[in-house]
Amino acid sequence: MTIKKGIYAASMSVFKDDLSLDANSYRIRVGHTIVAQDKVYVDRKLAMPSDETQLKIQGIQVKDPTFGLESIWIEQHLVSKAEANHYMIIEPEAVIATHLNNILLRYSGDLISQDDVQSLLDNLGKSNPQLIQSVVPKLVPLHHLTIILRNLLVERVPINDLKKILEALTNLSERKLSPEELSEAVRPAISSLLIQKISNINESLNVVTFNPEFEQMLIAMSKKSGSEGILIDPELVL
């Protein structure tokens, strides 16, 4: 299964004999860790109201598992009535598929391994052998590259253009940066991919900028805090 972020999801297993689950319930695990749990009703449809919906349809009221929006599991004979009242109707299997896809995107940083990264390098090496040979492991060890890609994925930064990422790492190799610092430093090289996620090519993109002094203060705080995030002094007055 391919994820649009540029990695392949590991194989998935489906277990139907978990006696600890209630009827109609399902769980999603990453490794042995339960990361999500919800219910689907295979004999019903999930109806999600829109802004134009006025009539309330009878059914099992829930929040959809992916986005937490108010929804109703309705019986089949109410589908036409719901559609006429501007409900969006979703099949139960689509509910699970959307939830699973969201989990894969959210936990993609946990899913990618050194073997996965090596597979990505092998694939890229077919068209760019010299680039691979000059970067990994000469400039960046495989385990460091894995950390860098994990960091990007955790922040939902796509790694589709691995070639650009490696080229950026080549230019940064002399700066003796940690994997965390390299993760941040490669962002400008893939800025076009980041922008494409939030804006079409012909659209204007509204941005918010900080005062240069405040920005430098945040950068300094980030370096001091490390992997714990940015720790801002509560006494700070802007």
Which ranges hold each PLM region?
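Membrane-embedded alpha-helical signal segments
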Residues: 1-238
